């Protein structure tokens, strides 16, 4: 999510962003969180740190993963941050994982989350995911190659 149109110099300003998420499996809570961002939190290092983009990917596994699988998934997710701007963190949930992005690039956030989704599907023995059609087409090149798309790669399509 991008807070404001930064290319136009816009940010949340005097506004307030509130979000609440609760995920339950049976009688057990897997995730419960609330987020409220106002002007002060936009610039605080424990808030947005002056960055306009935030995102969260939560995966609740259908069955508990073997510790080796979870370790491989988390280490791979950390390696997938290579070459991307922003602050990215990934950790284990019982069972599953949570990944968060905070930075200046919605493209970097989408790419990292797509890389993670590809790893999650591989762990489950599922096919390679398709690149979402609503995302800019040049990002499909980035999903397979961490190098930035160039004019040559986007016009060759």
What are these regions (language model features)?
Residues 3-157:
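A structural signal for small-residue-enriched, beta-sheet-centric alpha/beta enzyme cores
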């Amino acid at each position: 999510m991008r807070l404001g149109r930064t290319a136009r110099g816009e940010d949340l300003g005097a506004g307030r962003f509130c979000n609440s998420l609760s995920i339950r499996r049976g009688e057990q809570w897997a995730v419960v969180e609330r987020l409220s961002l106002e002007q002060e939190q936009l610039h605080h290092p424990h808030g947005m740190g002056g960055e306009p983009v935030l995102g969260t990917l939560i995966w609740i596994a259908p069955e508990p993963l073997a510790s080796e699988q979870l370790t491989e998934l988390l280490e791979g997710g950390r390696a997938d941050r290579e070459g991307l701007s922003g602050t990215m963190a990934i950790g284990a949930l019982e069972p599953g994982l949570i990944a968060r992005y905070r930075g200046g690039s919605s493209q970097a956030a989408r790419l990292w989350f797509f890389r993670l989704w590809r790893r999650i599907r591989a762990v489950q023995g599922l096919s390679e995911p398709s690149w979402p059609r609503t995302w800019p087409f040049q990002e499909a090149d980035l999903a397979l190659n961490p190098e930035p798309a160039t004019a040559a790669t986007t016009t060759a399509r």
